[in-house]
Amino acid sequence: MSDSVITQLKASPVRRGFALLVMMLLGFLLLYLTMTTDASFFHKVFLVAVAAAVLWMARAMQRGTTGYIELRTTGLFFENGRTLALIDDITRVERGVFAFKPSNGFVVSLKQKTNRAWIPGMYWKFGARIGIGGVTAPSDAKFMSDTLAVLIAEREGSSLMGMKL
């Protein structure tokens, strides 16, 4: 089987811009609150620390959402070649309403635990689960999750008739 790219999942420019705007606005509002309120030194230090963390996450999201996730015949990969999950390690794809998943995304369950990783707005890896989505376009994420479910069904040799995707 060749390692050809089936589909790519990129950040939606509108969703990315809105998410960055909200995070940066929150960070600057916290800094403004620190400057204008009459609070104790420890409260101000706490507000500055939270503002710095929010602005750092906004910068991490800005850098991370310039990339894309690829679904290849061998698995899920980030644009720089980082392996998210191999097809042989994936047990199922969850996209339901009550699934613990990113906004407009899906969750991939793995056979074994993986290293933790997180790119805000694109994906997170924790334990034996990978959440993909956030600032991505819902239609692209749905297509990728459906295609991944078909690849898993083909690997297991099961019929897709009656399968709930």
Language model segments and positions:
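N-terminal membrane-targeting/pre-transmembrane regions
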Residues: 1-38, 129, 159, 163-165
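A structural detector for beta-sheet-dominated domains
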Residues: 10, 72, 79, 111, ...
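Hydrophobic alpha-helical transmembrane segments of multipass integral membrane proteins
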Residues: 23-28, 48-55
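Conserved beta-hairpin
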Residues: 50-94
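Short edge beta-strand segments in beta-sheet-rich domains
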Residues: 66, 103, 125-127
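Acidic, Ser/Thr-rich low-complexity segments on the non-lumenal side of membrane proteins
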Residues: 83-115
